[in-house]
Design a protein with these regions (language model features):
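Basic, alpha-helical interaction scaffolds
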Residues: 414-418
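Alpha-helical solenoid repeat scaffolds of the TPR/TPR-like class and their adjacent stem/linker regions
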Residues: 1-413
Length: 418
């Protein structure tokens, strides 16, 4: 057990002895916060560990929770799990600890254990805001597991408790679309059909309606709610001038076995390297997939943005001297539109991931064709359209094609029409 930690206002002597019994939880929390602010997370953890072992027992579960939070932030997940388990062992109704324990299980690839913790929060009559949190976690993870009816039911319960949750409305609507649950905009609780309609995501709206006004409304609402307004000057203006090849940067979280990742490898490979330098800026989870290896090899430079905040990501793009930044994500799942709001490149373009307007103020151009953005729809597009001939969508011609299945392998008769 680490040495007791003295509670000193300046945190300058974190090892002087003091009787744990004399310390209140408030004392410990305040000192731990000072240690964290000083960059000494290890001492803050040791402080909690000492107080949990030898301090008064009344609020020990809270100290275990705080310790678990620190350990989780340091990615010491096994120790964080032990701390949260101790917290709920000491106080079984401690909803905060169960919520965090569920997140740890999810991160560890144990979805059923995560779901069990969040259901336990609901079974123990937690405060309403924590029940909402638990229902939302259940809905999100159940959707990820493709258990769509259960996911929809969970989000419905959340919205019955609080109908003023735009992101939850968005997912609820999309879940009904996935299940072909008609009508999609079925009122319930305090939510009207119109509120469900206006809460629809852009991608869901593009499949629900061909009305360009509704599509632009969905995109604009997302931007207003989710993308920060930045007053600072565009980042690219602060970069020194440079010469040489044009630097094109591709921005995406889908450079793997994803629809976009399957389409673009040959696009990257066929850039004229005498004229262009090709950069990738991605937050794709790293793996040894052959598809991801090929995508990496097709880029001259790859900058990983996973775990990097949006402002820092934009600075990395600006410092790379990117001339044209091509966003392959749009407003689809996993998008990071705030990066574009910083204006890291003098020209920013939307392409491929979203076949329509993004309404993002940092995007200048939309690469499209006569079908994605016909001239009569331009008034409903915030970007200026550049129409490619024939079809806007690239497709990798080198992609391996699976063998055509035989009728017999599908259990079909040879001499019958199906």
């Amino acid at each position: 057990m680490p040495s007791p930690v003295a509670l000193r206002p300046d945190a300058s002597n974190p090892t002087a002895p003091q009787a744990w019994a004399e310390l209140t939880l408030t004392d410990v929390v305040n000192q731990a916060q000072r240690l964290q602010q000083a960059g000494d997370d290890a001492a803050a953890m040791a402080l909690y560990q000492g107080w949990i072992a030898d301090g008064p027992p009344a609020l020990r579960h809270v100290a275990c929770f705080n310790l678990g939070t620190l350990l989780g932030a340091a990615h010491r997940d096994a120790e964080a799990e032990a701390a949260y388990r101790r917290a709920v062992e000491l106080q079984p109704d401690f909803a905060h600890a169960r919520l965090n324990l569920g997140h740890l299980f999810e991160r560890a690839g144990q979805p059923e254990s995560a779901l069990a913790q969040w259901r336990e929060v609901l079974a123990r009559s937690a405060p309403v805001e924590l029940r909402i949190h638990a229902w939302n976690n259940l809905g999100r993870l159940l959707e990820k597991l493709r258990r769509y009816p259960d996911a929809e039911a969970a989000l419905r319960e959340s919205l019955l408790l609080d109908p003023r949750q735009p992101s939850v409305i968005q997912h609820h609507v999309h879940l009904r679309q996935k299940q072909c649950a008609w009508p999609v905009y079925q009122p319930f609780g305090e939510l009207t059909a119109n509120q469900l309609l206006t809460g629809t995501s852009l991608l869901a709206m593009m499949s629900a309606s061909d009305d360009p006004t509704l599509q632009l409304l969905a995109a604009t609402r997302f931007v207003q709610e989710r993308v920060p307004r930045l007053a600072a000057a565009p980042l690219h203006r602060g970069m020194p001038p440079r010469s040489g090849r044009i630097r094109i940067g591709y921005l995406s979280g889908d450079l793997h076995l994803h629809a976009v990742g399957l389409l673009v490898p040959e696009l990257f490979e066929l850039h004229d390297r005498e004229k262009f330098e090709v950069w990738g800026f991605c937050w794709t989870p790293e793996s040894a997939q052959p598809q991801q290896r090929r995508l990496r090899a097709a880029l001259d430079h790859l900058v990983r943005l996973a775990g990097v905040d949006d402002g820092t990501a934009a600075r990395l793009i600006a410092e790379a001297g990117i001339d044209v930044l091509v966003d392959l994500q749009g407003l689809t799942a996993g998008a990071r539109p705030a990066i574009l709001a910083h204006r890291a490149a003098p020209v920013q373009v939307s392409y491929l991931g979203l076949p329509g307007t993004s309404a993002l103020p940092g995007v200048d151009w939309l690469l499209a064709d006569a079908y994605v953005m016909p001239p009569e729809l331009e008034p409903f597009c915030t970007e200026r359209a550049i129409r490619l001939p024939h079809c806007y969508q690239v497709s990798d011609r080198q992609r391996e094609v699976a063998l055509t299945p035989s009728r017999a392998s599908c259990g079909l008769p040879v001499d019958r029409f199906v």
